[in-house]
Amino acid sequence: MTNQVTIIGAGNLTTSLLTAIHRKKFSYKINVIDTDKKKKLVLKKFNVSFFASYTDVLTESDLLILMVKPNNYIQVIKEMNPYLSEKVVIVSFMAGIESSLIKSKLNHNVPVVRCMTNVTISDSESHVFYHMKPFSNKIVKRLDKFFNNFSKLKRCINEEDINKITALYGSGPAYYVYFNQIIKD
């Protein structure tokens, strides 16, 4: 393993995750891919490698974290497919997109783990809930190695539980952040 993680998407949840990572100062190389080049300035303080298009960094990554809007997932997977390797684990934080849908769009048979957390992860006070099918202790160890540096990893037996967690735990704080941004503006 290379201790390299690539995050696709640079929105609020990515910023929260990077804040937690930055505070803990652990030894992962972090890449972020987002087509909005303005996000590079926002992420500069986190000391990450920023890319505006898909590159070979996907091939070299241990974990590929999808943090894009669910309506963009088909295009994202289509664009990243040529760069995927068999060793990567895809970790999806996309609300409402089941693992089977992601797997059906991939060119490679790689593990897909569906996760959810919320913006409080920036304070290292959050849980990361996950579901994978089939279950693999080897993959859980990879997830533990990364996420347990700044959060608590919790397994969901059923993928439906991730949908419930998304509604209550993921979306609630996100709407609060959105509401506060509207008030400020």
Q: Model-found features: residue ranges?
A:
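Internal alpha-helical scaffold of NAD(P)-dependent oxidoreductase catalytic cores
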Residues: L101, K105-P111, H127-K164, Y175-D185
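Short beta-strand/turn micro-motifs composed of small residues
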Residues: G9, D34, V68, S92-M94, ...
